[in-house]
Amino acid sequence: MEIFSCKTKIISGSGAISALSELKAKRLLLVADPYFQKTDLPNRLKTAANAEALETFFEVTPDPTVELAAKGTAVVQRFKPDTVVALGGGSAMDCAKAMVYFSGQPVQFVAIPSTSGSGSEVTDFAILTHDGVKHPLVDRKLLPDMAILDAHLLDSLPKSLIADAGFDILAHALESFVATGAGAISRALAADGVKAVFDYLPESYAGNTSVRLRVHQAATMAGIAFSQSGLGLCHAMSHALGGQFHIPHGRLNAILLPAVMEANSAANSHYADLARGAGLGGAADTVAVRNLKNALIRLRKELNLPSTLSQAGIPPSRVRQATDTIVQAALSDPCCATNPVKPDEKTVRHILQQVTGVG
């Protein structure tokens, strides 16, 4: 039996923020990346929502901490909004989710992603960091009521962010497709997400803004997919490494994905289906899987992303020093529960050795 549920209303296209008027907000709290403090977007959102009062929280940082979420929660409890809007990347959306969740207050929650990667606008996940460890918070109450995918927000994305976020989409889609919780519907969404990234991400990276909405939508589809099916070892290790070294999450996924695919060879028939669906060919499963892995490596190179932790600026000596902590954090990460092969310490150490690189 397959159960599929998505409560989030998704509005997509140019000028989509006008949909805020549906909410009839009176007291609007905006949780946003600091960048937006210097723009007119907060006031535009207030106008679009016809809100009487606006409060802002611009203190979001990459890898939001438990302490930051607690500070934001106090703002929710003090201001008592009827509507909370999260604007920004995955960190802003995750921080806002935690603020709403821990405040215990009933609000309308809207997510407006300004990057194309995390899919947090449609997931029941939020990632908070404490003492160098990333902790996934998973609860259906974290699902936004509305997600707004506005093409106008994508025009000025920096190339590095397009690249990092694009590999986050790929990791979400690939891992959800082979996850133990996957079903026909989640796999269809994941497969379309993979194909869209291979088809459009290089163009977006090269500066073609007309295709960016399609990549944006792919991130949302992959987010819905993994919210239903779960993720896997790539994300477990990415969380562990990110907590230690503060490398962008998508960049870590780009480094890890090919090695994790090898470790998950028991899922090769599913990887092969993905490869064929993305137009990568391969009549035999082994050929299709190789084509998919090589396509990931080629795309990583085309987007100027590192292939090892060493290339990402982390010396092998630092990795060796933190290995035990990384392995423990990865194996205790909830994402391991839906990996197609139950990960063990030997597997994680082997992958870590593969991706460390030469100093």
Mark where each language-model region is.
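Gly/Pro-rich interdomain helix-loop hinge
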Residues: Q244-Q321, V358
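Glycine-rich phosphate/pyrophosphate-binding beta-alpha loops
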Residues: G117, T220-N253, D333-T338
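ATP/NTP phosphate-donor binding region
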Residues: M1-T83, L309-S310
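Carboxylate- and glycine-rich phosphate/diphosphate-binding segment that chelates Mg2+/Mn2+
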Residues: T123-S229
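Glycine/threonine-rich beta-strand-loop-alpha-helix active-site module
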Residues: E67-L153
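Short glycine/serine/threonine-rich phosphate/pyrophosphate-binding segments
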Residues: S14, L20, K38-L41, V66, ...
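Short, amphipathic C-terminal "tail helix"
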Residues: R318-G359
